[in-house]
């Protein structure tokens, strides 16, 4: 099964790739701004690495068209400090990038898109709460 991981050279993306490989998946593409072999480490020769920007629709279309994934793990995003420093770029990458991934998935008939967010979207004062799909999100930073 072909799998695409946006943000695939990030901390979570690399762990998802590792878990998929350990489960027997063999056709994994990591899509990231800097998917260098140094960044990918021991996964460099086990995944297809594609450089690109999730906030650029052409880049997203190209990688989805080329790889025809059945499943897309959408993990690519700008993190807290850069998002707060440059809100316009954060909107382009995080909001529009998500739209671009969903639209490319629709156009090229990916079976599933799995999206992972951040604890930053829930804000403060959530200790002890069980987080689920109905948990109120109260971000305190632009990133959230």
Stretches with model-predicted labels:
Residues 2-23:
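N-terminal Rossmann NAD(P)H-binding glycine-rich loop of SDR-like oxidoreductase domains
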Residues 6, 31, 72-78, 113-119:
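SDR active-site strand-loop-helix element
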Residues 14, 18, 85-114:
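NAD(P)-cofactor binding segment of oxidoreductase domains
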Residues 25-37:
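Conserved glycine-rich Rossmann-like NAD(P)H-binding loop of the short-chain dehydrogenase/reductase
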Residues 44-56:
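Rossmann-fold cofactor-recognition segment
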Residues 54-93, 124:
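NAD(P)H-binding glycine-rich loop region in Rossmannoid oxidoreductase-like domains
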Residues 89-91, 95, 129, 140-144:
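Short-chain dehydrogenase/reductase
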Residues 99-141:
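Conserved Rossmann-fold NAD(P)-dependent oxidoreductase catalytic core, especially the SDR/UDP-sugar
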């Amino acid at each position: 099964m072909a799998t695409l991981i946006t943000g695939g050279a990030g901390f979570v993306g690399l762990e998802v790739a590792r878990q998929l490989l350990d489960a027997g998946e063999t056709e994994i593409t990591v899509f990231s701004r800097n998917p260098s072999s140094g960044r990918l480490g021991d996964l460099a020769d086990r995944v297809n690495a594609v450089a690109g920007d999730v906030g650029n629709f052409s880049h997203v279309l190209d990688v989805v068209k080329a790889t025809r994934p059945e499943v897309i793990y959408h993990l690519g995003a700008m993190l807290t400090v850069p998002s707060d420093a440059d809100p316009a770029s954060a909107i382009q990458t995080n909001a529009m990038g998500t739209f671009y991934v969903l639209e490319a998935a629709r156009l090229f008939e990916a079976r599933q898109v799995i999206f992972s967010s951040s604890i930053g979207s829930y804000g403060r004062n959530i200790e002890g709460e069980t987080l689920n799909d109905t948990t109120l999100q109260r971000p305190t930073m632009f990133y959230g």
